[in-house]
Regions:
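RNA pseudouridine synthases
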Residues: 1-166, 186, 204-206, 231, ...
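Residue-level detector of flexible, active-site-proximal loop/helix-junction positions
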Residues: 151, 197, 227
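A generic structural motif
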Residues: 108, 170, 224-226
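Pseudouridine synthase
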Residues: 51, 158-221, 232
């Protein structure tokens, strides 16, 4: 199967692709689909659609301020502040590690039931403009927990069967591509990851399900509200394309409400 045979990883968006998850006077939280950039990027200068502009449309045309990153191929919870001061306070909380973030990922193989990945990462792993420059190496820590496993009778990479796991990921730091790079580091790359994954496994799922999305979804954030001081628990359910692929886990769909 050639690259030209693969379904397009970046769908065209019609209407506003964001789904509102939470709104108050100071914050707007949405579900971002896979394939949508959060904001303009010098690497993707040709792109014309961004979550930032769609969120602004949901905010009556008023400015919104993204307070954290979400990679283009990652779907899920994305939080905007509705004023600069709230953005500053919440941004500092993120930098201080005071925000709990949860993700779901489908990975190749069966990792241990739970574990901690404490593996420093370089600043710009895929930016060719920085390849000849010395890059700082920063501490990076991710906790993971295995939620479900499956084995399918499909021979990939020379094995008679192929194993996959659904895992919950909790990053304690926020390095670029941290979860994707950490799962690659422990030899359990995320399905659909064209930078750090396994090509043959990615091709199998793209061919089977008709899309080549990254199987990584931001599902929850817990933090102290930057204005009211209350504990805010935000949650975004995985979207249909993500849940479709999870059908290989059988009855996992029946427990959708219990997914972290």
């Amino acid at each position: 199967m050639s690259h030209s045979d693969l379904p397009a990883p970046c769908p065209a968006f019609y209407g506003n692709p964001l789904t509102e998850v939470y709104r108050d006077q100071w914050l707007l939280a949405v579900h971002k689909p896979a394939g949508l950039l959060v904001h303009r990027s010098p690497i993707d200068r040709h792109e014309t659609e961004f979550a930032l502009q769609y969120a602004r449309a949901m905010n009556a045309g008023e400015h919104v301020y993204p307070v954290h990153r979400l990679d283009r191929p990652t779907s899920g919870l994305l939080v905007f502040a509705r004023d600069p001061n709230t953005a500053s306070v919440l941004g500092k909380a993120l930098m201080a590690g005071a925000v709990q973030k949860s993700y779901l990922a489908m990975v190749r193989g069966w990792p241990q039931q739970e574990g901690v990945i404490n593996h420093p990462l370089r600043e710009h792993p895929t930016d060719r403009r920085c390849k000849d420059e010395p890059q700082p190496i920063r501490d990076a820590l991710t906790r993971y927990r295995r939620l479900a496993t499956t084995e399918i009778p499909v021979a990939i990479e020379g094995y008679p069967v192929s194993r996959y796991s659904l895992v919950a990921l909790h990053p304690a730091t926020g390095r670029k591509h941290q979860l994707r790079r950490h799962m690659q580091h422990i030899s359990h790359p995320i399905i659909g990851d064209t930078n750090y994954g396994r090509t043959k496994h990615n091709h199998y799922f793209a061919q089977t399900f008709g899309h080549s999305r990254l199987m990584l979804a931001a599902t929850a954030m817990v933090f102290t509200h930057p204005v009211t001081g209350t504990t805010l628990k935000l949650r975004a359910e995985p979207d249909a394309s993500f849940m479709q692929v999870l059908s290989i886990f059988g009855d996992i769909l029946a427990t959708r409400g219990s997914l972290p």
